[in-house]
Amino acid sequence: MLKYLVQRRFTSTFYELFPKTFPKKLPIWTIDQSRLRKEYRQLQAQHHPDMAQQGSEQSSTLNQAYHTLKDPLRRSQYMLKLLRNIDLTQEQTSNEVTTSDPQLLLKVLDIHDELSQMDDEAGVKLLEKQNKERIQDIEAQLGQCYNDKDYAAAVKLTVELKYWYNLAKAFKDWAPGKQLEMNH
């Protein structure tokens, strides 16, 4: 099955590669992560390059699909590309959305600046906790957007999620006095 889907990759979706997790083969937001991981491991055991001929391409496609679907940001970007042909992985598209909400960028930059000036771990942990809560809130809102087919709101939330994910990376890189880079 996987071999067939990989060979006709141009018509298949990542959801089709995991028929037990997604029996309807339709893009959905809410995912049973443990079921996805279990099915991924089973398929990987069958199609790993060491186990099957032509396994390298199949394994690579399977890896890409799994990592896209398990990560909320990448999943949302993928769903928007699939459902509305909006590619938020392209910087220009993402920037167009950001310019429509300059307050978002200012808020992210303010928090990033505050983080770079911090010298105590307790303050950083508090900011990091607040950022994790923002991310969880946006992920919940995205679920509602996809259920309601409100793709315009999903676009804005996905761009916002990308900024908060990048800020989460800055928390991991933080050390007192260390210069932090801000990616967007």
From Swiss-Prot:
<dbReference type="GO" id="GO:0006879">
    <property type="term" value="P:intracellular iron ion homeostasis"/>
</dbReference>
<dbReference type="GO" id="GO:0009060">
    <property type="term" value="P:aerobic respiration"/>
</dbReference>
<dbReference type="GO" id="GO:0044572">
    <property type="term" value="P:[4Fe-4S] cluster assembly"/>
</dbReference>
<dbReference type="GO" id="GO:0005758">
    <property type="term" value="C:mitochondrial intermembrane space"/>
</dbReference>
<keyword id="KW-0809">Transit peptide</keyword>
<dbReference type="InterPro" id="IPR036869">
    <property type="entry name" value="J_dom_sf"/>
</dbReference>
<dbReference type="Pfam" id="PF07743">
    <property type="entry name" value="HSCB_C"/>
</dbReference>
<dbReference type="GO" id="GO:0001671">
    <property type="term" value="F:ATPase activator activity"/>
</dbReference>
<dbReference type="GO" id="GO:0044571">
    <property type="term" value="P:[2Fe-2S] cluster assembly"/>
</dbReference>
<comment type="function">
    <text>Co-chaperone required for the assembly of iron-sulfur (Fe/S) clusters in mitochondria. Stimulates the ATPase activity of its specialized Hsp70 chaperone partner SSQ1, to mediate the transfer of iron-sulfur clusters from ISU1 to GRX5. Binds to the substrate protein ISU1 and targets it to SSQ1.</text>
</comment>
<comment type="subunit">
    <text>Interacts with ISU1 and SSQ1.</text>
</comment>
<dbReference type="GO" id="GO:0051259">
    <property type="term" value="P:protein complex oligomerization"/>
</dbReference>
<dbReference type="InterPro" id="IPR009073">
    <property type="entry name" value="HscB_oligo_C"/>
</dbReference>
<feature type="domain" description="J">
    <location>
        <begin position="13"/>
        <end position="82"/>
    </location>
</feature>
<dbReference type="GO" id="GO:0051087">
    <property type="term" value="F:protein-folding chaperone binding"/>
</dbReference>
<comment type="similarity">
    <text>Belongs to the HscB family.</text>
</comment>
<feature type="region of interest" description="Interaction with ISU1">
    <location>
        <begin position="71"/>
        <end position="184"/>
    </location>
</feature>
<dbReference type="GO" id="GO:0005743">
    <property type="term" value="C:mitochondrial inner membrane"/>
</dbReference>
<dbReference type="InterPro" id="IPR036386">
    <property type="entry name" value="HscB_C_sf"/>
</dbReference>
<dbReference type="Pfam" id="PF00226">
    <property type="entry name" value="DnaJ"/>
</dbReference>
<dbReference type="GO" id="GO:0005739">
    <property type="term" value="C:mitochondrion"/>
</dbReference>
<feature type="short sequence motif" description="HSP70 binding">
    <location>
        <begin position="48"/>
        <end position="50"/>
    </location>
</feature>
<protein>
    <recommendedName>
        <fullName>J-type co-chaperone JAC1, mitochondrial</fullName>
    </recommendedName>
</protein>
<keyword id="KW-0346">Stress response</keyword>
<dbReference type="InterPro" id="IPR001623">
    <property type="entry name" value="DnaJ_domain"/>
</dbReference>
<keyword id="KW-0496">Mitochondrion</keyword>
<keyword id="KW-0143">Chaperone</keyword>
<dbReference type="InterPro" id="IPR004640">
    <property type="entry name" value="HscB"/>
</dbReference>
<dbReference type="GO" id="GO:0005759">
    <property type="term" value="C:mitochondrial matrix"/>
</dbReference>
<feature type="transit peptide" description="Mitochondrion">
    <location>
        <begin position="1"/>
        <end position="10"/>
    </location>
</feature>
<dbReference type="GO" id="GO:0016226">
    <property type="term" value="P:iron-sulfur cluster assembly"/>
</dbReference>
